[in-house]
Amino acid sequence: MHIFINHGFRDYLKDNKKAFDTPINIMEMGLGSGLNALLTAESIDQQVVDYIGIEAHPITEKATYLSLINSLPHALDNQLIESFWDTPWNTPTKITPIFSLEKRHGKIENLELTPSSIDIIYYDAFAPECQPHLWQEDIMRTVLSWLKPGGYLLTYCAKGSFRRTCKSLGCRLESLPGPPGKREISRFVKQSKES
């Protein structure tokens, strides 16, 4: 299973007991094919989830989208796949009775969210070498401002300078085992002001 699901969504539910009808708010940077959103939707049993995914360069051809999704080793529910594709951009849409999705077309530097409104951030941007601006302190200050105290930010990035930036912005680093080919991943937990 995917690191965002196991070390993000599932661990967050274990560590933060919420009523099932109280939404878990998830924001994904780098929505791409929607794999993380689809896996999250498949993973929930009773917990309500409101999911925002931001993508600067969305897939525009349905055939390309289906080819990407169908090439995955994990078979996904066809109705869920169709619902994801059919969801209009920039409009919150109920995909299942307990999973709402808002696909936002745009760049993270233009995204406006309420401070301390997000429980989990899946930071699935390309590596700092490919998109350095997405890993700079000013962007991370904004992104982390959206995270609730105790909230998680997960990323494949284990670069020292990025880790130091997030720690300096009030997050505790948890290094976790990575998937095959990746030694470790980073989970940051936003500390409360009192910590």
Which residues make up each language-model segment?
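S-adenosyl-L-methionine
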Residues: 65-114
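A short glycine-rich, Lys/Arg-flanked "PGG" loop and its adjoining helix->strand segment in the class I
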Residues: 134-149
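Short beta->alpha hinge that forms the Motif I/post-I loop of the SAM-binding pocket
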Residues: 56, 135, 158
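A short SAM/SAH-binding and catalytic strip from SAM-dependent methyltransferases
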Residues: 119-133
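Class I S-adenosyl-L-methionine
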Residues: 159-195
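SAM cofactor-binding core of SAM-dependent methyltransferases
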Residues: 7-17, 21-82
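Conserved beta-strand signature within the Rossmann-like core of class I S-adenosyl-L-methionine
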Residues: 150-157
